Amino acid sequence: MLIRYKKAFEKIAMGLLSFMPNEKDLKKLQQTMKQYETEEDRQLFLWKEEEDIIGLIGVLVVNEYEVEIHHISVNPSHRHQGIGKSMVKALRDIYPDKELIPNENTAAFIEKCEICHGSE
C-alpha cells in the first residue's frame, strides 16, 4: 500500500533513498529530503506491507499533465518481488489524469517494467 511520507518516517525514507546511486552522499541525501518536505510540487510516498515500510517513490509534479518519477527504491531484501512495479501502478491511481514520466535516474527501471504508459 502506498502512503504519503510523514516526518516520523524520515530515517526510514533516508535509508531507502540512500540505495539510489545519486543519493549516497549524506549532504545530498539531506538536501533531497528537505526538498520533499518543503516543496509543494514534490511528493514522497512509502510502500507499506503489513507494518513494514519497504519501498519509496518520489515524484515532481511538473504541470497539470505530467508527474516525473525522481526516485524509486526498494529494500534489497524485498527486491525482485514486483514491489517497484506495484508502487508505480499505485502512483498511477493517485495521479490518474497525469502521464508518469521517468527522469534520468529512474528511466532504466521504468522502461524495463514498461509501466508508465499503462502497458502491463
Swiss-Prot record:
State the PROSITE patterns in the record: GNAT
Enzyme class label: transferase
**Record CDD domains:** NAT_SF
| Pfam families cross-referenced by the UniProt entry | Acetyltransf_1 (PF00583)
Ranges for the N-acetyltransferase domain?
3-120
Asked if the record carries the keyword Transferase, the reply is: yes
Q: Name one GO molecular function term.
A: acyltransferase activity, transferring groups other than amino-acyl groups
Q: Does Acyltransferase appear among the keywords?
A: yes
Keyword annotations: Acyltransferase, Transferase
EC number(s): the record gives 2.3.1.-
Q: Which PANTHER family match?
A: PEPTIDYL-LYSINE N-ACETYLTRANSFERASE YJAB
Q: What is this protein called?
A: Uncharacterized N-acetyltransferase in lysA 3'region
Native organism? Bacillus methanolicus
